[in-house]
Amino acid sequence: MLTAMLLSCVLLLALPPTLGVQMGVAPLKGIRRPDQALFPEFPGLSLNGLKKTTADRAEEVLLQKAEALAEVLDPQNRESRSPRRCVRLHESCLGQQVPCCDPCATCYCRFFNAFCYCRKLGTATNLCSRT
């Protein structure tokens, strides 16, 4: 039993050198710069391509997106809008992002915001209620 255990320990200690695993400081002697440490056996590979930070890459992506948006949102090539960009009094303003045509009117909603229309609201603090 003891001989089997000693034999297995010797084999485990002798296995890494036979497989070519280099242990110790010897492989690190030829490394002078950090970019040589990645793959010293391949001189073409280095960390130069990996040195870009994520902030630089994110900035490049944002610049590309901004250029693409500038091309899409060119004001000369934009389609003409409809002439009416407001909601008249007593017309539905439900789900619309345009204001009421009358500056004294607001979008008034009833029945749990299911029915909305432009309406003049008269209050004492509202300057439009006097007219």
UniProtKB/Swiss-Prot annotation:
A Pfam entry, by short name: Agouti
Entry's Gene Ontology BP terms: adult feeding behavior; circadian rhythm; eating behavior; hormone-mediated signaling pathway; long-day photoperiodism; maternal process involved in female pregnancy; neuropeptide signaling pathway; positive regulation of feeding behavior
Endpoints of the signal sequence: 1-20
Main localisation: secreted
Domain Agouti: residue ranges: 86-128
Annotated TM spans: none
Statement: the UniProt record of this protein carries the keyword Metal-binding: no
Tissues in which the UniProt entry reports expression: Expressed in arcuate nucleus and median eminence, adrenal gland (medulla), hypothalamus, testis, and lung.
Positions annotated as propeptide: 21-81
A GO cellular component entry from the record: Golgi lumen
GO molecular function: neuropeptide hormone activity; type 3 melanocortin receptor binding; type 4 melanocortin receptor binding
Subunit note: Interacts with melanocortin receptors MC3R, MC4R and MC5R.
Protein name: Agouti-related protein
Gene responsible for this protein: Agrp
